[in-house]
């Protein structure tokens, strides 16, 4: 863990901003790309740094903004999160969870956190096309909800609202009330 912190500090610095207010860089990336079950897969983790690096190359004039011997400006990591999320959702929907595409279309533009009852209405099996109904992981909206929970795509808060972690938020076309605008 200590070595990982040291590497991350050298890449982007100790903090995601000038002060600890925006978070420590060591925990920021995993906290923002883990699913609702706290699982972190290597591909999105690595892609976050890859996408951020590619943006740094495109904006080489900002290399002068780098502090000391750092390699990345933290805002590029924050911006990469949007692309990583979109990429992760494409992976899911192109592989074994193609039924999610119609749910994504229904949820696009909605704001999280959402009341559970409202969210469940988007899961009503009758809303899916006949073709996709056969792919659904359940016959009721509650069964589909349970699968989304198990997959880590959604989480339920203590006050029974539904939340979506950032690894899926942007790929689903969702917004977060009071959320910060991500750089592109």
Write out the residue ranges for each language-model feature.
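Short, small-residue-biased leader/transition segments that mark boundaries at the very start
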Residues: 2-7
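C-terminal leucine-rich, beta-strand-based interaction scaffolds used for sensing/assembly
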Residues: 8-184
């Amino acid at each position: 863990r200590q070595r990982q912190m040291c590497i991350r500090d050298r890449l982007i610095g100790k903090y995601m901003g000038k002060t600890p207010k925006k978070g420590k860089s060591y925990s920021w990336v995993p906290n923002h790309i883990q699913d609702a079950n706290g699982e972190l897969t290597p591909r999105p983790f690595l892609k976050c740094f890859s996408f951020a690096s590619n943006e740094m190359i495109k904006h080489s004039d900002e290399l002068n903004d780098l502090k000391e011997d750092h390699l990345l400006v933290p805002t590029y990591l924050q911006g990469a999160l949007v692309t990583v999320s979109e990429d992760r959702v494409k992976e899911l929907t192109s592989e074994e969870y193609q039924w999610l595409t119609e749910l994504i279309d229904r949820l696009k533009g909605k704001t999280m956190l959402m009341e559970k009852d409202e969210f469940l209405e988007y899961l009503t099996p009758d809303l899916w096309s006949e073709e996709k109904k056969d792919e659904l992981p359940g016959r009721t909206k509650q069964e589909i909800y349970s699968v989304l929970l198990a997959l880590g795509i959604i989480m339920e808060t203590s006050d029974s609202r539904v939340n979506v972690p950032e690894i899926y938020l942007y790929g689903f076309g969702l917004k977060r009330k009071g959320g910060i605008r991500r750089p592109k």
